[in-house]
């Protein structure tokens, strides 16, 4: 059995606002005929959410991210569903054998997002400063490729790309042009949670290493709990959007300072407001094993 060849028709979009939460799927052609889109975009920030290998836009943890954004009331969320090209529909026993096939589709899906972005900018006058991309695993690299493509198209840079535990296999040794990179947007935020499915390599403007970027609390033994750790990046980010917790990043060092001594000029809160902090670089983030994952006794900076 061979995976279905990639085409733009194999990628679907779900368009959500706080007023419209129906999980209707759109293609590139049908979105152009979506008459309500213009009015929706004018009023909102735009966030693309992109899943990874063998997943889908309707996976529970991605819908939770969308819901958290919509609860803020000022977002239009475009969920990219590339499940066919991500081998989600393949027979369970052979999915892993098709990983490289999914990898080869990442740039194509990134170009697809860039095409949608071009339509938003040129047809609906959406400023690039109003658009942020959020991607998990392979979806993080897809977001990076979209960031490269919109620059090639002369559209400028996205406001921000947030990479949720970018996939390590096939990417960790690649140069900037072949993976998500700090130049792909005005601000690139990376949340590291696993060192096998993800990567410990610094990739962004800021790199947050949750529990040192591996073996997340509550996920069990190393290797066995790797999938749990890999997905935990999405859950941490969702909690940060909800503001139930400020996950504070401390500058990485051999002996990182206690969170209790953090100031706004030295440390950074993970999430949508990270780019409002002056510090960039790599940060260690202590976390707990259960939601909301805080390990700072409610401290905010």
Curated annotation (Swiss-Prot):
Q: How is the polypeptide modified once translated? A: Is not glycosylated.
Q: Which cysteines share a disulfide bond?
A: 87-294, 176-245, 181-262, 219-228, 240-246, 267-269
InterPro entries recorded: AB_hydrolase_fold (IPR029058), Allerg_PlipaseA1 (IPR002334), Lipase (IPR013818), Lipase_N (IPR033906), TAG_lipase (IPR000734)
Q: What is its EC number?
A: 3.1.1.32
Q: What are the UniProt keywords, alphabetically?
A: Allergen, Cytolysis, Disulfide bond, Hemolysis, Hydrolase, Lipid degradation, Lipid metabolism, Secreted
PROSITE patterns documented for this protein: LIPASE_SER
Which sequence ranges are marked TM in the entry?
A: none
Q: How does activity depend on temperature?
A: Loses its activity after heat treatment.
Reaction(s) catalysed (UniProt annotation):
a 1,2-diacyl-sn-glycero-3-phosphocholine + H2O = a 2-acyl-sn-glycero-3-phosphocholine + a fatty acid + H(+)
Family membership: Belongs to the AB hydrolase superfamily. Lipase family.
State what protein this is by name.
Phospholipase A1 VesT1.02
Tell me what organism the protein belongs to. Vespa tropica (Greater banded hornet)
């Amino acid at each position: 059995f061979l995976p279905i060849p990639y085409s733009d028709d194999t990628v679907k979009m779900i368009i959500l606002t706080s007023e419209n939460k129906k999980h209707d799927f759109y293609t590139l052609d049908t979105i152009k005929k979506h008459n309500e889109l213009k009015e929706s975009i004018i009023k909102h920030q735009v966030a693309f959410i992109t899943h990874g290998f063998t997943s889908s836009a309707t996976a529970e943890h991605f819908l939770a991210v969308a819901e958290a954004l919509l609860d803020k009331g000022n977002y239009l969320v475009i969920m990219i569903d590339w499940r066919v090209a991500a081998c989600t529909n393949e027979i369970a026993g052979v999915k892993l054998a098709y990983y490289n096939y999914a990898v080869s589709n990442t740039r194509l899906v990134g170009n697809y997002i860039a095409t949608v972005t071009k339509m938003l900018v040129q047809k609906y006058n959406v400023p690039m400063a109003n658009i942020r991309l959020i991607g998990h695993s392979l979806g993080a690299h897809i977001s990076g490729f979209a960031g490269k493509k919109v620059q090639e198209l002369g559209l400028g840079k996205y406001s921000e790309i947030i990479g949720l535990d970018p996939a390590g296999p096939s990417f960790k040794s690649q140069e900037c042009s072949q993976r998500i990179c700090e130049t792909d947007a005005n601000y690139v935020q990376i949340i590291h949670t696993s060192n096998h499915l993800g990567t410990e390599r610094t990739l962004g403007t800021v790199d947050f290493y949750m529990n040192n970027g591996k073996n997340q609390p509550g996920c069990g033994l190393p290797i066995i709990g790797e999938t749990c750790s890999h997905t935990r990046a999405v859950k941490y980010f969702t909690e940060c959007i909800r503001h139930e917790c400020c996950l504070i990043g401390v500058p990485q060092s051999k002996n990182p300072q206690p969170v209790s001594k953090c100031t706004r000029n030295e440390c950074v809160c993970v999430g949508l407001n990270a780019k409002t902090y002056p510090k960039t670089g790599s940060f260690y983030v202590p976390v707990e094993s259960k939601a909301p994952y805080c390990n700072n006794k409610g401290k905010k900076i």
